[in-house]
Amino acid sequence: MQKQQVKKVAVTWRKRYLILLYIGIIIFGLMACNSKSGIEKTKSLGSDSTAAENKIDLTKIKIGYCTPSLNAPFYVVLSQYIKKNAEGFGMKFVSADGQDDIIKQITSIEDLIAAGVNVLIVNPLDHKAMVPAVNAAVKSGVPVFIVDSYIDPTANYITSIQANNEGNGELIGEWIVNKMGKTKIKAALISGSQGNPVGKEKRLGFIRGFSEMQLMSQGNVDLTIVSQGWGNWTNNGGLKAMEDILVANPDINLLVAENDAMGMGALKAINEAGKAAGITIVGFDGQKEAYELIKEGKFGATALNSPEELGRLVVNAVVKYLNGERQIDKVIYTPAVLITKDNVDKYYDPKAIF
């Protein structure tokens, strides 16, 4: 594991900058509602929960899936659910691992096309770099579906199935204001990988949700982000990033991790430093182990990004397309859901694989 880079960033909210920020939020953002535990937010660009009705023989269809990596539990489980749903319709399933490398993911897509897949599902490592590979697949006659992320609109894809990452971030930000009150926030971020659009959506949603809630409830915004580490979406990456953060900023009182795995790794570093009582930890994805930590009072909150639901929805869209349906939303979002100690029992399943 490469040594984690820690980028110090000071976010100082001055009055004039706050006004500009808030105007920008109103214009470009999704307006947030007051959050309560378990509140859901949806985007207007479509959500499709209806089961696909299959009227054709799919047993000769080979569906290919290219994941950006298998280094995080989320990616592993998402691949498993896509496989389960595809095989449930009788389709053959093949997959390829991009191994956290853009060139490798591009060649993996090419390999899947060469292997004769009829349909391709891609979770892009980079939303711009994957465009030529996706368009080449479509040109060869293979329709492409995007899952768990988005791709540049110049790509010729059928639909993108993704979590409402900005909405999840907003819910996390609102919860922090309600939880920490007028405590002066000194926060650190642990992000996944540089340039990843999903991580960016989460942290911008967090800043927006925090700003709107604190402005509404306290009349001002006071948030300082003193450090950003990179954990590559892994438990060990979160541990290493947090160790570096604590050396430079031992007095932080909030950690926002862009997935639960990194947050749990960071918790280990926080415990080893003897600072668990003074730092609130929040994450994203809704991993089973994070739910357990919430129940134990060691994790503040997480936001739901269900690999099970993503796997179901993307295969649903594939089946509808193969059955001739063309009125498929260009983007399909799963709802944003906040999980805290108040509603964790509703979502926690000790037998869940994620």
Identify what each model region corresponds to.
Residues Q2-K3, A10-W13, Y17, A32-F354:
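A residue-level marker of the well-folded mature domains of exported/periplasmic proteins
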